[in-house]
Amino acid sequence: MAKKPTALIILDGFANRESEHGNAVKLANKPNFDRYYNKYPTTQIEASGLDVGLPEGQMGNSEVGHMNIGAGRIVYQSLTRINKSIEDGDFFENDVLNNAIAHVNSHDSALHIFGLLSDGGVHSHYKHLFALLELAKKQGVEKVYVHAFLDGRDVDQKSALKYIEETEAKFNELGIGQFASVSGRYYAMDRDKRWEREEKAYNAIRNFDAPTYATAKEGVEASYNEGLTDEFVVPFIVENQNDGVNDGDAVIFYNFRPDRAAQLSEIFANRAFEGFKVEQVKDLFYATFTKYNDNIDAAIVFEKVDLNNTIGEIAQNNNLTQLRIAETEKYPHVTYFMSGGRNEEFKGERRRLIDSPKVATYDLKPEMSAYEVKDALLEELNKGDLDLIILNFANPDMVGHSGMLEPTIKAIEAVDECLGEVVDKILDMDGYAIITADHGNSDQVLTDDDQPMTTHTTNPVPVIVTKEGVTLRETGRLGDLAPTLLDLLNVEQPEDMTGESLIKH
Protein backbone atom coordinates (compact mmCIF):
# COMPACT_ATOMS: atom_id res chain seq x y z
CA MET A 1 0.00 0.00 0.00
CA ALA A 2 1.32 3.45 -0.94
CA LYS A 3 2.46 5.69 1.90
CA LYS A 4 0.83 9.04 2.62
CA PRO A 5 3.58 11.58 1.94
CA THR A 6 4.06 14.86 3.81
CA ALA A 7 5.80 17.50 1.69
CA LEU A 8 7.50 20.79 2.46
CA ILE A 9 7.36 22.85 -0.73
CA ILE A 10 9.64 25.90 -0.69
CA LEU A 11 8.90 28.59 -3.28
CA ASP A 12 12.30 30.26 -3.08
CA GLY A 13 12.16 34.06 -2.79
CA PHE A 14 8.34 34.33 -2.62
CA ALA A 15 6.97 36.64 0.11
CA ASN A 16 3.91 38.64 1.10
CA ARG A 17 3.80 42.35 0.30
CA GLU A 18 0.73 44.59 0.11
CA SER A 19 1.75 46.90 -2.74
CA GLU A 20 1.36 45.58 -6.28
CA HIS A 21 4.11 47.85 -7.61
CA GLY A 22 6.99 45.71 -8.88
CA ASN A 23 5.42 42.76 -7.05
CA ALA A 24 5.63 39.69 -9.29
CA VAL A 25 3.98 37.56 -6.59
CA LYS A 26 0.85 39.75 -6.67
CA LEU A 27 0.85 40.34 -10.43
CA ALA A 28 1.38 36.73 -11.53
CA ASN A 29 -1.58 34.59 -12.52
CA LYS A 30 -1.27 31.71 -10.04
CA PRO A 31 -4.59 29.85 -9.88
CA ASN A 32 -3.18 26.83 -8.02
CA PHE A 33 -1.52 28.77 -5.22
CA ASP A 34 -4.66 30.91 -4.88
CA ARG A 35 -6.88 27.82 -4.79
CA TYR A 36 -4.90 26.26 -1.94
CA TYR A 37 -4.64 29.62 -0.18
CA ASN A 38 -8.41 30.07 -0.22
CA LYS A 39 -9.25 26.49 0.71
CA TYR A 40 -6.77 25.60 3.45
CA PRO A 41 -5.47 27.15 6.71
CA THR A 42 -2.87 29.89 6.14
CA THR A 43 -0.59 32.17 8.10
CA GLN A 44 2.60 34.15 7.52
CA ILE A 45 5.95 33.83 9.25
CA GLU A 46 9.13 35.88 9.61
CA ALA A 47 12.15 34.95 7.49
CA SER A 48 14.67 37.70 8.26
CA GLY A 49 16.62 39.43 11.02
CA LEU A 50 16.60 38.18 14.59
CA ASP A 51 13.97 35.54 13.75
CA VAL A 52 16.56 33.62 11.72
CA GLY A 53 19.67 34.42 13.77
CA LEU A 54 20.76 37.44 11.71
CA PRO A 55 21.28 41.01 12.91
CA GLU A 56 18.08 43.03 13.30
CA GLY A 57 16.65 44.19 9.97
CA GLN A 58 19.03 41.99 7.93
CA MET A 59 17.27 40.33 5.01
CA GLY A 60 17.16 36.56 4.97
CA ASN A 61 18.63 34.37 2.25
CA SER A 62 18.41 30.79 1.02
CA GLU A 63 21.29 29.41 3.06
CA VAL A 64 20.04 30.93 6.31
CA GLY A 65 16.44 30.10 5.48
CA HIS A 66 17.01 26.42 4.79
CA MET A 67 19.29 26.08 7.82
CA ASN A 68 16.58 27.50 10.10
CA ILE A 69 13.84 25.46 8.44
CA GLY A 70 15.73 22.18 8.79
CA ALA A 71 16.91 22.85 12.34
CA GLY A 72 13.48 23.79 13.62
CA ARG A 73 14.98 26.54 15.76
CA ILE A 74 16.76 29.89 15.43
CA VAL A 75 20.26 29.20 14.10
CA TYR A 76 22.71 31.98 14.87
CA GLN A 77 24.37 32.77 11.57
CA SER A 78 28.00 33.34 10.68
CA LEU A 79 27.39 37.07 10.19
CA THR A 80 26.09 37.40 13.75
CA ARG A 81 28.92 35.26 15.18
CA ILE A 82 31.65 37.21 13.37
CA ASN A 83 30.17 40.61 14.28
CA LYS A 84 30.07 39.52 17.92
CA SER A 85 33.69 38.29 17.83
CA ILE A 86 34.82 41.68 16.45
CA GLU A 87 32.82 43.55 19.11
CA ASP A 88 34.19 41.30 21.89
CA GLY A 89 37.77 41.54 20.62
CA ASP A 90 38.06 37.74 20.20
CA PHE A 91 38.50 38.28 16.47
CA PHE A 92 41.89 39.92 17.03
CA GLU A 93 43.07 36.97 19.14
CA ASN A 94 41.95 34.36 16.58
CA ASP A 95 44.72 31.77 16.09
CA VAL A 96 44.16 31.24 12.37
CA LEU A 97 44.18 34.95 11.57
CA ASN A 98 47.30 35.48 13.65
CA ASN A 99 48.99 32.45 12.05
CA ALA A 100 48.31 33.91 8.59
CA ILE A 101 49.92 37.16 9.64
CA ALA A 102 52.87 35.41 11.32
CA HIS A 103 53.42 33.52 8.02
CA VAL A 104 53.58 36.83 6.13
CA ASN A 105 55.89 38.45 8.66
CA SER A 106 58.28 35.47 8.72
CA HIS A 107 58.43 35.29 4.90
CA ASP A 108 58.58 39.08 4.41
CA SER A 109 55.71 38.50 1.98
CA ALA A 110 52.26 39.92 1.25
CA LEU A 111 48.83 39.45 2.79
CA HIS A 112 46.04 39.19 0.21
CA ILE A 113 42.45 39.66 1.30
CA PHE A 114 39.69 38.25 -0.92
CA GLY A 115 36.01 38.99 -0.46
CA LEU A 116 32.73 40.45 -1.62
CA LEU A 117 32.91 44.20 -1.02
CA SER A 118 29.45 45.14 0.24
CA ASP A 119 27.23 45.24 3.30
CA GLY A 120 24.72 42.84 1.76
CA GLY A 121 25.39 40.45 4.63
CA VAL A 122 24.48 37.41 2.53
CA HIS A 123 27.99 36.25 1.60
CA SER A 124 30.14 38.75 3.46
CA HIS A 125 30.28 42.15 5.13
CA TYR A 126 32.90 44.71 4.23
CA LYS A 127 33.25 45.75 7.89
CA HIS A 128 34.92 42.34 8.38
CA LEU A 129 37.53 43.48 5.84
CA PHE A 130 38.06 46.61 7.96
CA ALA A 131 38.65 44.43 11.04
CA LEU A 132 41.24 42.41 9.07
CA LEU A 133 43.00 45.62 8.05
CA GLU A 134 43.08 46.74 11.69
CA LEU A 135 44.56 43.39 12.73
CA ALA A 136 47.22 43.58 9.99
CA LYS A 137 48.13 47.12 11.08
CA LYS A 138 48.38 46.02 14.73
CA GLN A 139 50.69 43.14 13.75
CA GLY A 140 52.95 45.31 11.61
CA VAL A 141 52.16 43.85 8.17
CA GLU A 142 53.44 46.16 5.45
CA LYS A 143 52.08 44.70 2.23
CA VAL A 144 48.29 44.22 2.28
CA TYR A 145 46.44 43.79 -1.01
CA VAL A 146 42.67 43.68 -1.31
CA HIS A 147 41.10 41.72 -4.17
CA ALA A 148 37.58 43.10 -4.21
CA PHE A 149 34.60 41.25 -5.64
CA LEU A 150 31.75 43.60 -6.54
CA ASP A 151 28.21 42.74 -5.54
CA GLY A 152 25.31 44.52 -7.28
CA ARG A 153 23.00 41.68 -6.39
CA ASP A 154 22.46 41.67 -2.63
CA VAL A 155 22.82 45.46 -2.72
CA ASP A 156 22.04 48.09 -5.37
CA GLN A 157 23.28 47.25 -8.86
CA LYS A 158 25.62 50.24 -8.99
CA SER A 159 26.75 50.78 -5.41
CA ALA A 160 30.40 49.66 -5.68
CA LEU A 161 31.93 53.15 -5.68
CA LYS A 162 30.51 53.84 -2.22
CA TYR A 163 32.21 50.73 -0.79
CA ILE A 164 35.44 51.44 -2.68
CA GLU A 165 35.59 55.01 -1.34
CA GLU A 166 34.92 53.87 2.25
CA THR A 167 37.59 51.18 1.95
CA GLU A 168 40.13 53.65 0.55
CA ALA A 169 39.35 55.97 3.46
CA LYS A 170 40.14 53.04 5.78
CA PHE A 171 43.44 52.40 3.92
CA ASN A 172 44.35 56.06 4.45
CA GLU A 173 43.30 56.08 8.10
CA LEU A 174 45.41 53.00 8.92
CA GLY A 175 48.26 53.73 6.52
CA ILE A 176 48.11 50.21 5.05
CA GLY A 177 46.24 48.40 2.31
CA GLN A 178 45.48 48.99 -1.34
CA PHE A 179 43.28 47.51 -4.02
CA ALA A 180 45.13 45.00 -6.20
CA SER A 181 42.31 43.65 -8.37
CA VAL A 182 38.57 44.07 -8.85
CA SER A 183 36.12 41.50 -10.24
CA GLY A 184 32.37 41.35 -10.58
CA ARG A 185 30.94 38.46 -8.54
CA TYR A 186 29.66 36.92 -11.79
CA TYR A 187 33.31 35.96 -12.42
CA ALA A 188 34.91 35.54 -8.98
CA MET A 189 31.93 33.92 -7.26
CA ASP A 190 30.49 31.47 -9.77
CA ARG A 191 29.17 28.22 -8.31
CA ASP A 192 28.28 26.23 -11.45
CA LYS A 193 31.78 25.22 -12.58
CA ARG A 194 31.89 27.87 -15.28
CA TRP A 195 35.66 27.91 -15.05
CA GLU A 196 36.04 30.34 -17.95
CA ARG A 197 34.53 32.98 -15.63
CA GLU A 198 36.70 32.09 -12.64
CA GLU A 199 39.79 32.07 -14.86
CA LYS A 200 39.29 35.76 -15.64
CA ALA A 201 39.14 36.57 -11.91
CA TYR A 202 42.13 34.32 -11.21
CA ASN A 203 44.22 36.05 -13.89
CA ALA A 204 43.48 39.46 -12.37
CA ILE A 205 44.31 38.21 -8.85
CA ARG A 206 47.59 36.60 -9.99
CA ASN A 207 48.42 39.77 -11.97
CA PHE A 208 48.67 37.78 -15.17
CA ASP A 209 46.50 38.85 -18.04
CA ALA A 210 43.70 41.33 -17.38
CA PRO A 211 42.80 44.93 -18.20
CA THR A 212 44.65 47.43 -15.99
CA TYR A 213 43.43 50.72 -14.51
CA ALA A 214 45.15 53.34 -12.39
CA THR A 215 42.53 53.07 -9.63
CA ALA A 216 39.64 50.81 -8.64
CA LYS A 217 37.26 53.73 -9.16
CA GLU A 218 38.51 54.33 -12.70
CA GLY A 219 37.98 50.67 -13.63
CA VAL A 220 34.45 50.61 -12.23
CA GLU A 221 33.51 53.85 -13.99
CA ALA A 222 34.84 52.45 -17.28
CA SER A 223 32.66 49.37 -16.74
CA TYR A 224 29.61 51.56 -16.10
CA ASN A 225 30.33 53.39 -19.35
CA GLU A 226 30.16 50.02 -21.10
CA GLY A 227 26.71 49.40 -19.62
CA LEU A 228 27.86 46.88 -16.99
CA THR A 229 26.56 46.80 -13.42
CA ASP A 230 28.72 45.80 -10.43
CA GLU A 231 27.98 42.08 -10.64
CA PHE A 232 29.24 41.87 -14.22
CA VAL A 233 32.38 44.06 -14.03
CA VAL A 234 35.06 42.22 -16.01
CA PRO A 235 38.03 41.45 -13.72
CA PHE A 236 40.78 44.06 -13.86
CA ILE A 237 44.10 44.81 -12.20
CA VAL A 238 44.70 48.01 -10.23
CA GLU A 239 48.13 49.50 -10.96
CA ASN A 240 50.43 49.34 -7.93
CA GLN A 241 53.60 47.61 -6.77
CA ASN A 242 51.65 44.37 -6.29
CA ASP A 243 52.61 41.51 -8.60
CA GLY A 244 49.78 39.17 -7.65
CA VAL A 245 49.59 36.25 -5.25
CA ASN A 246 53.07 34.72 -5.06
CA ASP A 247 55.07 32.01 -3.30
CA GLY A 248 55.17 32.51 0.47
CA ASP A 249 52.17 34.87 0.58
CA ALA A 250 49.02 34.45 2.66
CA VAL A 251 45.38 34.77 1.60
CA ILE A 252 42.41 35.42 3.88
CA PHE A 253 39.03 35.00 2.17
CA TYR A 254 36.44 36.77 4.32
CA ASN A 255 33.26 35.49 2.64
CA PHE A 256 31.44 33.44 5.26
CA ARG A 257 28.94 31.77 2.96
CA PRO A 258 30.63 28.77 1.30
CA ASP A 259 28.76 28.14 -1.93
CA ARG A 260 30.10 31.05 -3.99
CA ALA A 261 33.56 31.15 -2.40
CA ALA A 262 34.47 27.49 -2.94
CA GLN A 263 35.45 27.49 -6.62
CA LEU A 264 37.98 30.31 -6.44
CA SER A 265 39.43 28.72 -3.30
CA GLU A 266 39.83 25.39 -5.09
CA ILE A 267 41.95 27.09 -7.75
CA PHE A 268 44.38 28.30 -5.06
CA ALA A 269 44.13 25.58 -2.42
CA ASN A 270 43.23 22.28 -4.08
CA ARG A 271 46.29 20.51 -5.47
CA ALA A 272 44.05 18.27 -7.59
CA PHE A 273 42.33 21.21 -9.29
CA GLU A 274 41.62 20.48 -12.97
CA GLY A 275 39.21 23.25 -14.07
CA PHE A 276 41.92 24.91 -16.14
CA LYS A 277 45.72 25.04 -16.17
CA VAL A 278 47.12 26.88 -13.15
CA GLU A 279 50.57 27.62 -11.78
CA GLN A 280 50.37 26.46 -8.17
CA VAL A 281 51.52 29.02 -5.60
CA LYS A 282 54.11 27.43 -3.33
CA ASP A 283 54.11 27.81 0.46
CA LEU A 284 50.81 29.73 0.38
CA PHE A 285 48.97 30.13 3.69
CA TYR A 286 45.30 30.01 2.71
CA ALA A 287 42.61 30.85 5.28
CA THR A 288 38.84 31.04 4.85
CA PHE A 289 36.35 32.51 7.30
CA THR A 290 34.28 29.30 7.26
CA LYS A 291 34.75 25.84 5.77
CA TYR A 292 33.89 26.01 2.06
CA ASN A 293 34.27 22.34 1.13
CA ASP A 294 36.36 19.22 1.75
CA ASN A 295 38.59 19.69 -1.33
CA ILE A 296 40.10 22.94 -0.12
CA ASP A 297 43.26 22.83 1.97
CA ALA A 298 42.54 25.88 4.11
CA ALA A 299 42.81 27.00 7.71
CA ILE A 300 39.31 27.78 9.00
CA VAL A 301 38.86 31.01 10.95
CA PHE A 302 35.38 30.22 12.35
CA GLU A 303 34.73 26.50 12.73
CA LYS A 304 31.20 25.24 12.16
CA VAL A 305 28.84 24.78 15.10
CA ASP A 306 27.29 21.32 14.82
CA LEU A 307 23.51 21.12 14.58
CA ASN A 308 21.89 17.93 15.84
CA ASN A 309 18.32 16.72 15.49
CA THR A 310 17.53 18.44 12.20
CA ILE A 311 14.40 17.31 10.35
CA GLY A 312 16.40 14.75 8.33
CA GLU A 313 18.00 13.18 11.37
CA ILE A 314 14.65 12.91 13.18
CA ALA A 315 13.11 11.29 10.09
CA GLN A 316 15.98 8.77 10.04
CA ASN A 317 15.60 8.04 13.76
CA ASN A 318 11.92 7.30 13.20
CA ASN A 319 12.60 5.00 10.22
CA LEU A 320 10.94 7.38 7.77
CA THR A 321 11.92 7.65 4.11
CA GLN A 322 12.70 11.09 2.75
CA LEU A 323 13.37 12.73 -0.60
CA ARG A 324 15.32 15.97 -1.17
CA ILE A 325 14.72 17.43 -4.63
CA ALA A 326 15.69 20.68 -6.40
CA GLU A 327 17.49 21.98 -9.45
CA THR A 328 21.21 22.81 -9.30
CA GLU A 329 20.84 26.38 -8.00
CA LYS A 330 19.02 25.27 -4.85
CA TYR A 331 20.22 21.69 -4.48
CA PRO A 332 22.79 22.51 -1.74
CA HIS A 333 20.00 24.23 0.15
CA VAL A 334 17.62 21.24 0.32
CA THR A 335 20.53 18.92 1.17
CA TYR A 336 23.55 20.45 2.95
CA PHE A 337 21.86 23.48 4.53
CA MET A 338 18.58 21.72 5.33
CA SER A 339 20.66 19.08 7.14
CA GLY A 340 22.47 21.67 9.26
CA GLY A 341 25.71 21.66 7.26
CA ARG A 342 25.91 17.92 6.65
CA ASN A 343 26.66 16.50 3.19
CA GLU A 344 26.02 12.80 3.87
CA GLU A 345 22.58 11.35 3.25
CA PHE A 346 20.62 10.06 6.23
CA LYS A 347 19.44 6.46 6.30
CA GLY A 348 16.25 6.30 4.25
CA GLU A 349 17.08 9.53 2.37
CA ARG A 350 17.38 9.82 -1.37
CA ARG A 351 18.09 12.83 -3.52
CA ARG A 352 17.20 14.08 -6.98
CA LEU A 353 19.31 16.79 -8.58
CA ILE A 354 17.88 18.33 -11.75
CA ASP A 355 20.34 20.40 -13.81
CA SER A 356 19.63 24.12 -13.99
CA PRO A 357 19.58 25.44 -17.56
CA LYS A 358 22.89 26.72 -18.93
CA VAL A 359 21.93 30.30 -19.72
CA ALA A 360 23.83 33.51 -18.95
CA THR A 361 21.03 34.86 -16.73
CA TYR A 362 17.76 33.20 -15.77
CA ASP A 363 15.49 35.97 -17.09
CA LEU A 364 16.29 34.36 -20.47
CA LYS A 365 14.56 31.15 -19.32
CA PRO A 366 12.20 32.05 -16.46
CA GLU A 367 10.78 28.54 -16.17
CA MET A 368 14.34 27.31 -15.47
CA SER A 369 14.02 23.55 -14.77
CA ALA A 370 10.73 23.70 -12.83
CA TYR A 371 8.90 21.32 -15.18
CA GLU A 372 11.73 18.78 -14.99
CA VAL A 373 11.76 19.03 -11.18
CA LYS A 374 8.00 18.48 -11.15
CA ASP A 375 8.24 15.46 -13.46
CA ALA A 376 11.00 13.91 -11.36
CA LEU A 377 8.95 14.40 -8.19
CA LEU A 378 5.83 12.82 -9.73
CA GLU A 379 8.00 9.87 -10.75
CA GLU A 380 9.24 9.53 -7.14
CA LEU A 381 5.71 9.87 -5.73
CA ASN A 382 4.50 7.08 -8.00
CA LYS A 383 6.87 4.70 -6.21
CA GLY A 384 4.58 5.10 -3.20
CA ASP A 385 7.36 4.73 -0.62
CA LEU A 386 7.94 8.28 0.64
CA ASP A 387 7.10 9.66 4.08
CA LEU A 388 8.74 13.09 3.82
CA ILE A 389 9.54 15.27 0.81
CA ILE A 390 11.56 18.48 0.81
CA LEU A 391 11.21 20.30 -2.51
CA ASN A 392 12.49 23.67 -3.68
CA PHE A 393 11.38 25.66 -6.72
CA ALA A 394 14.24 28.10 -7.44
CA ASN A 395 12.53 30.38 -9.96
CA PRO A 396 11.02 33.25 -7.93
CA ASP A 397 14.42 33.90 -6.34
CA MET A 398 16.79 33.26 -9.23
CA VAL A 399 14.73 35.17 -11.80
CA GLY A 400 13.81 37.80 -9.20
CA HIS A 401 17.53 38.60 -8.93
CA SER A 402 17.37 39.96 -12.48
CA GLY A 403 15.25 42.88 -11.26
CA MET A 404 13.05 42.33 -14.33
CA LEU A 405 9.31 42.21 -13.67
CA GLU A 406 7.97 40.33 -16.70
CA PRO A 407 10.39 37.37 -16.53
CA THR A 408 9.80 37.11 -12.76
CA ILE A 409 6.03 36.98 -13.32
CA LYS A 410 6.61 34.22 -15.90
CA ALA A 411 8.82 32.38 -13.41
CA ILE A 412 6.07 32.37 -10.79
CA GLU A 413 3.44 31.30 -13.31
CA ALA A 414 5.60 28.34 -14.37
CA VAL A 415 6.10 27.33 -10.73
CA ASP A 416 2.37 27.63 -10.06
CA GLU A 417 1.61 25.23 -12.89
CA CYS A 418 4.04 22.70 -11.39
CA LEU A 419 2.76 23.33 -7.87
CA GLY A 420 -0.75 22.36 -8.93
CA GLU A 421 0.30 18.99 -10.31
CA VAL A 422 2.52 18.17 -7.34
CA VAL A 423 0.10 19.16 -4.57
CA ASP A 424 -2.91 17.55 -6.24
CA LYS A 425 -0.94 14.30 -6.53
CA ILE A 426 0.01 14.46 -2.83
CA LEU A 427 -3.61 15.13 -1.86
CA ASP A 428 -4.74 12.20 -4.04
CA MET A 429 -2.42 10.02 -1.94
CA ASP A 430 -4.07 11.34 1.28
CA GLY A 431 -0.86 13.20 2.09
CA TYR A 432 -0.24 16.77 3.27
CA ALA A 433 1.73 19.69 1.88
CA ILE A 434 3.14 22.78 3.55
CA ILE A 435 3.59 25.47 0.90
CA THR A 436 5.92 28.25 2.02
CA ALA A 437 9.14 30.18 1.21
CA ASP A 438 12.57 30.84 2.67
CA HIS A 439 12.78 34.64 2.17
CA GLY A 440 11.44 37.43 -0.02
CA ASN A 441 12.66 38.61 -3.42
CA SER A 442 10.09 38.33 -6.23
CA ASP A 443 7.63 40.33 -4.11
CA GLN A 444 9.65 43.43 -5.05
CA VAL A 445 11.74 43.48 -8.21
CA LEU A 446 11.34 47.20 -8.91
CA THR A 447 12.07 50.18 -6.67
CA ASP A 448 9.44 52.89 -6.18
CA ASP A 449 10.94 54.79 -9.12
CA ASP A 450 10.92 51.70 -11.37
CA GLN A 451 14.60 50.85 -11.15
CA PRO A 452 15.51 47.12 -11.05
CA MET A 453 15.66 45.83 -7.47
CA THR A 454 17.80 42.70 -7.37
CA THR A 455 18.02 42.19 -3.61
CA HIS A 456 16.04 40.04 -1.21
CA THR A 457 13.32 41.64 0.93
CA THR A 458 12.53 41.36 4.64
CA ASN A 459 8.84 40.66 4.04
CA PRO A 460 7.13 37.74 5.82
CA VAL A 461 6.50 34.56 3.84
CA PRO A 462 3.18 32.75 3.40
CA VAL A 463 2.39 29.33 4.85
CA ILE A 464 -0.39 27.07 3.58
CA VAL A 465 -1.02 23.75 5.35
CA THR A 466 -3.25 21.51 3.24
CA LYS A 467 -5.06 19.97 6.18
CA GLU A 468 -8.66 20.98 6.71
CA GLY A 469 -10.07 21.48 10.17
CA VAL A 470 -6.91 22.83 11.83
CA THR A 471 -6.11 26.40 12.87
CA LEU A 472 -2.68 27.99 12.45
CA ARG A 473 -0.98 30.44 14.80
CA GLU A 474 -1.06 34.03 13.57
CA THR A 475 2.71 34.51 13.66
CA GLY A 476 5.83 32.41 13.63
CA ARG A 477 9.24 32.08 12.03
CA LEU A 478 11.04 29.69 9.67
CA GLY A 479 12.19 27.61 12.65
CA ASP A 480 8.56 26.62 13.23
CA LEU A 481 8.23 24.72 9.94
CA ALA A 482 10.07 21.52 10.95
CA PRO A 483 7.95 21.18 14.13
CA THR A 484 4.86 21.62 11.92
CA LEU A 485 6.08 18.82 9.63
CA LEU A 486 6.65 16.56 12.65
CA ASP A 487 3.14 17.42 13.85
CA LEU A 488 1.68 16.30 10.49
CA LEU A 489 3.87 13.15 10.57
CA ASN A 490 2.79 12.37 14.18
CA VAL A 491 6.44 12.28 15.24
CA GLU A 492 7.57 13.57 18.63
CA GLN A 493 9.59 16.78 18.58
CA PRO A 494 12.99 16.52 20.36
CA GLU A 495 13.94 19.05 23.03
CA ASP A 496 16.73 20.75 21.09
CA MET A 497 14.28 21.60 18.29
CA THR A 498 12.93 24.68 20.04
CA GLY A 499 10.56 25.94 17.33
CA GLU A 500 6.81 25.42 17.77
CA SER A 501 4.31 23.80 15.43
CA LEU A 502 2.23 26.40 13.60
CA ILE A 503 -0.84 24.20 14.15
CA LYS A 504 -2.80 25.26 17.23
CA HIS A 505 -3.68 22.45 19.66
Curated annotation (Swiss-Prot):
Binding residues annotated for Mn(2+) 1, in chain numbering: D397, H401, H456
GO terms for cellular component: cytosol
Alphabetical GO biological process terms: glucose catabolic process; glycolytic process
Cofactor binding, per record: Binds 2 manganese ions per subunit.
Keyword Isomerase found: yes
Keyword hit for Manganese: yes
Highest taxon listed in the record's lineage: Bacteria
Residues where Mn(2+) 2 binds: D12, S62, D438, H439
GO molecular function per UniProt: manganese ion binding; phosphoglycerate mutase activity
Residue numbers binding substrate: H123, R153, D154, R185, R191, R257, P258, D259, R260, K330
Protein task: Catalyzes the interconversion of 2-phosphoglycerate and 3-phosphoglycerate.
Name of the protein in question: 2,3-bisphosphoglycerate-independent phosphoglycerate mutase
Source species of the chain: Staphylococcus aureus (strain COL)
Protein's gene: gpmI
